Swiss-Prot record:
Protein name: Succinate-semialdehyde dehydrogenase
Pathway info: Alkaloid degradation; nicotine degradation
InterPro entries for this protein: Ald_DH/histidinol_DH, Ald_DH_C, Ald_DH_CS_GLU, Ald_DH_N, Aldehyde_DH_dom, Aldehyde_DH_Superfamily
Quaternary structure and interacting proteins, as annotated: Homodimer.
Binding site for NADP(+): 119-120, 143-146, 197-198, 220, 350
High-level lineage: Bacteria, Bacillati, Actinomycetota, Actinomycetes, Micrococcales
Entry binding sites for substrate: 128, 247, 253, 410
GO molecular function: succinate-semialdehyde dehydrogenase (NAD+) activity; succinate-semialdehyde dehydrogenase (NADP+) activity
Gene Ontology BP terms: gamma-aminobutyric acid catabolic process; nicotine catabolic process
């Protein structure tokens, strides 16, 4: 046991919202430069405490320390990025086409927000939501996942030390997610909900948010295709596949989930990919030699093994791995499956683990059809030496983010988000702050006639 926390009640959630509402007016009027400086100090503090955050995340959810350190750097970057974006949230002033009246457009904070974060990236998902909300002038209630509440507590403490006023960020940790979101979504004072998690839960939150027509940002499930064309550099494709599949042990919504490889190079790619996967070391996240940590719980391990077993029963071949690791802990062998039938269940849902199913295609149009054969549309990865082909395919596949010869594409400066059932809205980039503002238009009579 790492620690014990009080489980927040519905009353605690409402009290947190009341604190956010009380702070909203003064926070919205705080100068953008002041908000920017708070975010920049928070970046410096999180970076200085990198080892503390990394160890805490490893202890909470098992990821290797190297992965955790990478998350700290990635998560901190949202604080720095939005510290710089805070003063660039421009409106505009223009003359009407008729030339008489004037148009003034300004951006205002949307108001108190509910931010719900997942367990797989407990720091980065918090900073990716909190930073733009702070930049826009919004107050917040942050609900971290019940499996990883400690990281958010440390982050909130760090934000306070950076100078964030009381009431702007209110963390409510609870074993009952609905006990927090339920009463808040019924309260008309809440003006936005931002959620990262599963599509079914996101749909329920959107339904509840419709009661008061709340602004919503939904970063939901993914089923990313990793497409390798016959003209790709296979060594670089394998390197990218390892990054896209094994970041965070595969417990990421952007993780490559379906490896679509052109028939003429499928055997060579699969052989090299399996060799790289099989060479990974599995162990406790605190062991410096570990490259793959445990899954989040026993249920996750059992679900993954059921998908692998069903695929093998349907004709797939486990080239490497294919079973839980013997001994204590929720470990699963890094696995590559070849000859996976296109109708296999493992190709149709998020795996959220270290398993890579490989299937083949014949033509470019076949690859596009297979890539789009999913209700999800978050991330996709394309490997080819032909840039025109990459552009053609990217324009025809239904995904919010596409990597060209790159296995990791997330960046604070880029708009993160998907289409179809992968969600609504964008986090990061210049688009990120817009998710927390509302647009007000002011019509001004002709100043030369008044």
């Amino acid at each position: 046991m790492l620690a014990t926390l009080a489980s927040a009640t519905s009353e605690d959630a409402v009290a947190a919202l009341e604190a956010a509402c009380a702070a909203q007016t003064s926070w919205a009027r705080t100068a953008p430069r002041v908000r920017a400086e708070i975010l920049r100090r928070a970046f410096d503090l999180v970076t200085a405490r990198s080892e503390d955050f990394a160890l805490l995340m490893t202890l909470e959810m098992g990821k290797p320390l190297a992965e955790a350190r990478g998350e700290v750097a990635y998560g901190a970057e949202f604080l720095r990025w939005f510290s710089e974006e805070t003063v660039r949230d421009y409106g505009r002033y223009l003359t009407t086409p008729e030339g008489k009246n004037k148009i003034l457009v300004q951006h205002k904070p949307v108001g108190p927000c509910l931010l719900i974060t997942p367990w797989n990236f407990p720091l980065a998902m918090a900073t990716r939501k909190v930073a733009p909300a702070v930049a826009a002038g919004c107050t917040m209630v942050l609900k971290p996942a019940k499996l990883t509440p400690l990281t958010s507590q440390l982050f909130a403490q760090t934000m306070m030390e950076a100078g964030l006023p009381a009431g702007v960020l209110n963390v409510v940790s609870s074993s009952s997610a609905s006990g927090i979101s339920g009463p808040l979504l019924k309260d008309s004072r809440l003006r936005k909900v931002s959620f990262t998690g599963s599509t079914p839960v996101g749909k329920r939150l959107m339904s509840d948010a419709s009661r008061h027509v709340l602004r919503t940002s939904m970063e939901l499930g993914g089923n990313a295709p990793f497409v390798v064309f016959e003209d790709a550099d296979l060594d670089k494709a394998v390197e990218g596949a390892m990054a896209a599949k094994m970041r965070n042990m595969g417990e990421a919504c952007t993780a490559a989930n379906r490896f679509l490889v052109q028939e003429s190079v499928a055997q060579e790619f699969t052989r090299k990919f399996a060799a790289a996967m099989g060479a990974l070391s599995t162990g406790r996240g605190t062991d410096p030699a570990s490259q793959v940590g445990p899954l989040i719980n026993n249920g996750a391990r059992d679900d993954i093994h059921a998908l692998v077993t069903a695929a093998v029963d349907a004709g797939a071949v486990a080239v490497t791995g294919g079973a839980p690791v013997d001994g204590p802990g929720y470990f699963y062998q890094p696995t590559v499956l070849a000859d996976v039938p296109n109708n296999a269940a493992i190709l149709g849902q998020e795996i959220f683990g270290p398993v890579a199913p490989v299937t083949t295609f014949t033509t470019e149009q076949d690859a596009i059809k297979l890539a789009n054969a999913s209700e999800y549309g978050l991330a996709a990865y394309l490997y080819s030496r032909d840039f025109n082909r990459l552009l053609r395919v990217a324009e025809q596949i239904e995904f919010g983010m596409v990597g060209f010869n790159a296995g990791i594409i997330s960046n604070a400066a880029a708009p993160f988000g998907g289409v179809k059932q992968s969600g609504l809205g964008r986090e990061g980039g210049s688009e990120g702050i817009a998710e927390y503002t509302t647009t007000q238009y002011i019509g001004i009579a002709d100043p030369y006639e008044n």
